Amino acid sequence: MRIDAQSLIGPAIAALYLKDCFLLLGHDEAVLVRGWRGRWRAGFGLRDWQLRRREPYLCHPFKPWEPVLRLHWDAAAAPAAPPTAPAAFAAEPRLGPWVALVWLILFVALPAAFFGHLGLPAVLAVLAGLYATIAIALVRVWRARSAFGLSRSEFGVLAFEVLACAPYAANLVRRLSLHRAVDENLLAAAPRLLDVPALAAVHAGVAARIDDELDVVEEGSARAQALRAARPRFAPPEDNDAEAKDST
């Protein structure tokens, strides 16, 4: 069976893009994603399928304009005081439309021109539009680089990566948001940013990971005692009610 090299261009672009959407989270890490109209949601990696003891997490491949923040958490730590400042994320310079346009060119316009046999001029025109869009986005990043905490050298590396590998440019918003260090932990940020169902999902994820850690830590250790003391904070209300009835 002979494989045409040209037929691999589309899968290669998709693979590079998905690779850049892929995160490996520590057992004490999660992400906060800012979606439509500023609504936040949280995400954990896969508990049952790990790579090097890290949990795989795939950012939404069809929503590249959503900022993603990586946060740490420790269920056994004392609850953090309510923050006095907004979430630690600088307003991006309206990169969403440009990133969405890069995504559309890569996965709609370019395949249509290439596989639709529209001719070399059409393909070159699409590529010119793609790199013009990336260049405009990079100019906007350069002008707001201080808000993103980017030095000149860091911006240079970022610009080289997205120009050398255009699929990475579709993840420009995520690359910038993940670059920022967030000094607020998940358990402090979640009650402030998430609605009730999303917060309940975070509590369920934390509770499951507490149970996982209790299975491996030494029984009776200080860590185990701290985790057992913290566990009720993340249990569903009905579970706490049942425990209260059992104790009486």
Give residue ranges: language-model regions:
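Long, highly hydrophobic alpha-helical transmembrane signal-anchor segments
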Residues: 1-34, 111-129
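Broad hydrophobic/π-residue packing in well-ordered secondary structure
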Residues: 37-48, 133, 140, 225, ...
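Charged, low-complexity cytosol-facing tails and large interhelical loops of integral membrane proteins
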Residues: 153-248
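Weak global preference for isoleucine
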Residues: 3, 9, 13, 105, ...
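Transmembrane-cytosolic junction motif
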Residues: 18-40, 134-155
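Membrane-interface amphipathic/juxtamembrane segments adjacent to transmembrane helices
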Residues: 21-71
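Transmembrane helical hairpin unit
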Residues: 74-187
